[in-house]
Amino acid sequence: EKETAYQAIYSAIHDVREIIPEAIFLQAEPDLVGMSDLADLIGCTRQNIRKLLTNDSSSPSPCYSYAFSLWHLADILFWLQESKSYAIDQSLLEVSEVNMKLNISVHQLKTDKNTSTDRAIKDLAKFAVFNQLSIR
C-alpha cells in the first residue's frame, strides 16, 4: 500500500519528536521556492521560468516579492500541470501541497491568540479572498 505524502511527513515529524523531544519545528520543505529552485526542480532554465511566470497573467502570484520573489511550490506545480500541461511528479506535487498547508497552519497556530483582532483579521482574509465578510 502506497504511503501518502501526509503519512510520510507525519511519520518524519513523529520520528524526530521521538529522538529529539525538544526539537522546534520551523518549516517543512519544499514549500517556498525562488526561480532558481523552480528551474532545478522542474528541469529547465531560470530564464524559462522567468518567461513562464512573467508572460502569463494566470501564473500564481509570489507570496513574497521585494529584492527577489518566492512562491509556494505547490501553487506553481499545480499551475504548470493544469495550465501549461507540464508532466509533474505527483509525489512532489503532493508533498509540496502538504508542506504548504502545514507551514501555513503552524504559522497561524504560533501567531493566533484568538483575540477579537485575530477574529477580525480572519474575516478580513475571507473578504479579501472570497469577498465574504461577517461583521462582528
Label each PLM-derived region with a short phrase:
Residues 1-16:
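Short, intrinsically disordered low-complexity segments
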Residues 43-70:
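Major-groove DNA-recognition helix of helix-turn-helix-type DNA-binding domains
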Residues 76-131:
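A short, Lys/Arg-enriched interface patch at domain edges and termini
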